[in-house]
Amino acid sequence: MDLIQALAAELGKDPRHVENVVHLLDEGNTIPFIARYRKELHGAMDDTSLRTLEERLQYLRGLEERREAVKKSIDEQGKLTDELVAAIDSAKTLAEVEDLYRPYKQKRRTRATMSKEKGLEPLAALLFAQERDCLRPEEAARDFVDPEKGVETVEDALQGASDIIAEQISDDAAIRKSLRALISRQGQLVSRAATEDDSVYRLYYDFTQSVARLQGHQVLAINRGEKEGILKVSITLDREQALPLLRRAVVKPGSAAMEFVKSAAEDAYDRLIFPSLEREVRNQLTEQADEGAIGQFALNLKPLLMQPPVKGKVTMGLDPGYRMGCKVAVVDGTGKVLDTAVVYPTYGERQKNEAIAALATLIKKHGVEHIAIGNGTASRETEQMAVELIRQVNEGSAHVSYMIVSEAGASVYSASKLAAEEFPQYDVNLRSAVSIARRLQDPLAELVKIDPKAIGVGQYQHDMPQKQLDEALNGVVEDCVNAVGVDINTASPSLLQRVAGLNGTTAKNVVSYREENGAFTSRAQIKKVPKLGPKAFQQCAGFLRVPESRSVLDNTAVHPESYDAAKALLDLTGHTLADVKGGRLADLPDRVKAYGEDKAAGEIGVGVPTLRDIVSELLKPGRDVRDELPKPILRTDVLEMKDLKPGMVLTGTVRNVIDFGVFVDIGVHQDGLVHISQVSNKFIKHPSEVVSVGDVVKVVVLEVDEKKKRISLSMKQAK
């Protein structure tokens, strides 16, 4: 089965579409560009499917390279047979290839290699053959006693032969494959306490679970506990299940050497095979858990980045703190800093009242409409102060509301070189207040400045393979930025470098060109940016918006290569570009439908998927896909934990989705947990089947433990 067929079968896709995507990737096209502008070639796969395909393509190509390297190595030893070539070529995983290569690998000195050096290989071969007329092992071994070679006795000779046979059995690919499968089906992971002290790992102090039923979060927690020296972990398998399988594979009844080989097989299992497979299975469990956790991290990150912006509103950002006070920044509707301050609401009643007065003055002076409060240290006290402040100012003509904003990564950003370049005139602490305000206004534009790992919506992210995690999360950020589109005249270099086809250098060049020549007035002008060649322009053009352009198409996701098609469609349906600008296209979908989609697509020279995208963009030039998502919950009052009672029905925002449940912000300082058993009335394997980060959900309070600061919630009982 060739590469294309293998990918198509594995992913359940049309081989023609898979082949087209492979060609597009090999030509240097980006995933966002392929997903958006080459739908006809891949059957409208989404960006997630395309990234999975790209990942599997890299794996299978790596597998093919390893196959060739292994065959070459064995061939150089003069041991490559047609059967071995066929076995290597049909191996589906790297583990299978390595099993086949194992007998031919250069080995460190082992008991078997030392026995071979003593000339005991012929004895091992004689006994392992188990011919019916074979001599008894003790008799066969007499001829191999040679004190000069270190074989002093018959027992020494037999021990050496047994070591050689044991290693040969251990290197058998078919045996390893069968036993690996047996451990995966029947093996158990056992975790025991390595200390008597209490810890966060107490759940795993006396824990046994089938390998097949282990959850990813359990594996990652156990691994961390083991790494910290708190847990002792092992894989167990009933020896009496494994040995019969081994005996059937290597023991030939009726031979005088049968019992000797049986004993060597048991030694192979205990000393070589099981310890090796235990490590393999542990590694495989970790890889699967890492893969699942990275996937969940990516799944959680996307809705966080895609939170609807609160556009055009003057916003006050509060970065709470105790010793250093509460840092304050007021930004206008475009995110430009208007004012900054530091207040001390936690120092006492007098200072709190002074803080309220100072903030009320800022609200009145700048017409603040929203307050964004960071959720870190002293957030609770700051929120209570903000509610008092809002009550006071809203008694007049103001209509101020607030929202708790995740400040994950804000301190890292505020101390970064990027923040220093953006706000050289402001103290590090005030920069984080600006970032918090902007996170409410446009979460995506602000969060792209931060390493995705610092945004804090994953489990055990520091334990995962960082390269794999970075690739997955950067892919999510890239997909989100390109799905939304970027205003080329206001975007920061951090945002621009996430646009398909651009990088750090070309993003800075775009900003430099903008500063030297003024705002871009057309997409065509982008071609003048230094080091931004034709390929980069092709990839990025459709994702960059130019609101100042005289052509309305430059402020849509219609790619310049489809401008002629868009104009032809307007002609075909009796419309003009002026109608697009004036929002007079309400009947466009009906006119296209009446004309016939296939016929219209054929006449304007595009496929039906592209036709539909053009229609969608012409209807709403400059649209932001995030505006169609549930709006963030802005509050004017605060709930205390003591106010919560079982049975209360509340509305909240999903903050995190993990293997065992969902964390929901219900307006109390502590997020509540909806255990997986309380997420849905139907059986689900993972909460992400039902809910995503950022979703607004109804919940019922089940239990409140003020002492432990735990809130148990139910989604299914609220339905």
Language-model features: where?
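Generic start-of-chain signal for non-secretory N-termini
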Residues: 1-19, 26
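Long, highly charged, low-complexity intrinsically disordered interaction regions
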Residues: 3, 61-79, 89, 412, ...
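Short, ordered loop/turn segments at secondary-structure junctions
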Residues: 37-39, 128, 238, 320, ...
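Duplex nucleic acid-engaging cores and interfaces of nucleic-acid transaction enzymes
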Residues: 49-52, 59, 63-317, 321-426, ...
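Structured, non-catalytic alpha/beta "coupling" segments that mediate domain-domain communication
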Residues: 73, 87, 98-101, 225-238, ...
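A glycine-rich phosphate-binding loop feature that marks nucleotide/adenosyl-phosphate handling sites
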Residues: 181-188, 318-322, 376-378, 404-412, ...
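Single-stranded RNA-binding regions, centering on S1/OB-family and related RNA-binding modules
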Residues: 546-550, 554-719
